[in-house]
């Protein structure tokens, strides 16, 4: 649960930064920023749902120590839900404002601008490129905008790919943390079981047999971690 909460905090920080940027440059913010915020909101909601499922399981069948921790986890869950609700409402408000400004800009666009493809809100985002292509002696002015659009699309594809890769890596890190936590639990259970068997008078030979079996399981566990790290390496190598 701690790993999920840390993951949710990272998503929360990302949302705070992106929404603040969208609010600051609402008129000229790129469309890709809205897509990034939408994707992070969906991922944040999914993380909260996973956290809630773990919380419900722990509260339903937890020990006394876990029950004492329930208030802390419940407060975290309530806080995360409130944050998601606030982010979602703020994003909808900014999107509505963006659409209204964009529509107003097109409404008051002069006929001459409409015929010559004058600057709209979208073209303002390409000011630097338009200035370059409109300089005297620049023979590629008729092809500047299509080339820029192609570069923008390619950059947007790379950004989405990097965002998906980061999400995969975060999920892998979360899975690795869960596996390490489960390994620690298994080690504690093994120690408790060995002490219990000795207390019950079970022979050392039987205990050694059990420990050998546990050791084999541990080797399998280490092999799985190794294969996981190799997989992450090849994913990074493939995408980058």
Curated annotation (Swiss-Prot):
GO terms for molecular function: SNAP receptor activity; SNARE binding. Its main location: Golgi. It holds the Pfam family Sec20. The keyword Membrane applies. One of its GO terms (biological process) is vesicle fusion with Golgi apparatus. The chain crosses the membrane at residues 219-239. Residues 240 are vesicular. It is a single-pass type IV membrane protein. Keywords: Endoplasmic reticulum, ER-Golgi transport, Golgi apparatus, Membrane, Protein transport, Transmembrane, Transmembrane helix, Transport. It is found in: Golgi apparatus membrane; Endoplasmic reticulum membrane. GO terms for cellular component: endoplasmic reticulum membrane; ER to Golgi transport vesicle membrane; Golgi membrane; late endosome membrane; SNARE complex. Residues 1-218 are cytoplasmic. SNARE required for protein transport between the ER and the Golgi complex. Belongs to the BOS1 family. This is Protein transport protein BOS1.
